[in-house]
């Protein structure tokens, strides 16, 4: 659910999201009325479930993804570095099960997942950059009635998801 109240209380509710880049660089200039789903940080860095339709949810942190893949019997097909050091696109398949619940192979569908290496980007660093990217394209996306848009911060392209009715940034992740 969206966070309500003043901008400072919105940002405080999700862990001082107003501070970008960590400290000395200052405070973000977020557009009027902009709010963030408080679960974004958890989604970026932790396992958020696995479905047959969507694959692994959350786990954009490489270590968390690898742990979720191992735990859930996922088959990693490839890891392709992007143009940004520390950002990688992983392609994977999820297990297929028989009626008894036994793994009998893998689903044909190949799922992509963009992950960040926590040795290069901290969870907070990715969160800060994602919020900066979200703020950058926010007004334009809202005026066009978009539910998702791409925006760049720190050289990283983020896919940003909006609730176009409330204006809340519901999610974002490196693309």
Please report, for each region that a protein language model flagged, where it lies by residue.
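Active-site or metal-binding loop neighborhoods of secreted/extracellular toxin and effector enzymes
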Residues: 134-175
């Amino acid at each position: 659910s969206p966070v309500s109240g003043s901008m400072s209380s919105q940002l405080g509710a999700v862990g001082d999201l107003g501070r970008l880049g960590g400290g000395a660089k200052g405070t973000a200039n977020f557009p009027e009325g902009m709010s963030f789903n408080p679960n974004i940080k958890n989604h970026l860095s932790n396992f958020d479930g696995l479905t047959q339709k969507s694959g692994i949810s959350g786990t954009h942190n490489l270590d968390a993804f690898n742990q979720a893949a191992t735990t859930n019997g996922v088959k990693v097909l490839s890891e392709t570095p992007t143009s940004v050091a520390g950002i990688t696109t992983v392609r994977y398949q999820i297990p297929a099960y028989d009626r008894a619940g036994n793994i009998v192979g893998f689903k044909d569908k190949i799922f992509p997942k963009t992950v960040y290496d926590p040795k290069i980007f901290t969870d907070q660093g990715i969160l800060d950059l994602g919020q900066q990217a979200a703020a950058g394209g926010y007004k334009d996306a809202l005026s066009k009635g978009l539910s998702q848009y791409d925006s760049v911060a720190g050289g990283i392209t983020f896919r940003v998801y909006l609730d176009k009715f409330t204006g809340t940034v519901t999610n974002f992740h490196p693309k």
